Amino acid sequence: GSNDFMRF
């Protein structure tokens, strides 16, 4: 998604 950078 557009917030994939929040996946740790």
From Swiss-Prot:
Cellular component annotations (GO), alphabetically ordered: extracellular region
Positions bearing Phenylalanine amide: F8
Localization terms from the record: Secreted
GO biological process terms on file: neuropeptide signaling pathway
Ranges in a coiled coil: none
UniProt keyword annotations, A-Z: Amidation, Neuropeptide, Secreted
Name of the protein this chain belongs to: FMRFamide-7
Annotated source species: Sarcophaga bullata (Grey flesh fly)
